[in-house]
Amino acid sequence: MSSASPIRVIGIDPGSNVTGWGVIDGLGQRQQVVEYGTIRLDGKEPLPMRLHQIHAQLVSLIQRLQPHEMAVEEVFVSQNVQSALKLGHARGAAIVAGAQMGLPIAEYTAMQVKKAVVGYGRAEKNQMQEMMRMLLNLDKKPAQDAADGLAIAMCHLNQRQWHQQTLPAAILGLQRGGRA
């Protein structure tokens, strides 16, 4: 892939009842939404069936939208251990889907995503939705989980951009006798 080709990233906000996702093409500073949405699951279904649905639907999305990379939100461990375990399972189903399709997978905490997108690591859900609408030039605010998926993809693209700009400079400094 040439350096002038956009990188397509799918961002995943895993959940055992609703999994949000967003696909963004990034080229330099430019980012454009490809598609976004949610995978809504019946909470009355047994967890293994919901995990299968997350996996199958993400594989289908990856096949259709052809992202180059995947970014997934890390599990936030709350006081409710059962919820954290279910979230971890949903996250695992998403990661396996990406790995099965051969995608490199990056992981970010919710705080990293919020800080990268809003500039504040404790931003509220509605702030994230509005920021996604503004930054990605959307007609309306995306659903919360879809906005999170878009934000995760955007965070990853921003991290890639930052590494591409700073890493060559660091290497160049080392080659000139600088220190790491």
UniProtKB/Swiss-Prot annotation:
Coiled-coil stretches noted in the UniProt entry, renumbered to this chain: none
Entry keyword set: Cytoplasm, DNA damage, DNA recombination, DNA repair, DNA-binding, Endonuclease, Hydrolase, Magnesium, Metal-binding, Nuclease
Location, primary (coarse class): cytoplasm
Entry EC no(s): 3.1.21.10
GO molecular function, one term: magnesium ion binding
Catalytic activity as recorded in UniProt: Endonucleolytic cleavage at a junction such as a reciprocal single-stranded crossover between two homologous DNA duplexes (Holliday junction)
Active site: D13, E73, D145
Protein location: Cytoplasm
GO biological process: DNA recombination; DNA repair
Protein name: Crossover junction endodeoxyribonuclease RuvC
Lineage: Bacteria, Pseudomonadati, Pseudomonadota, Alphaproteobacteria, Magnetococcales
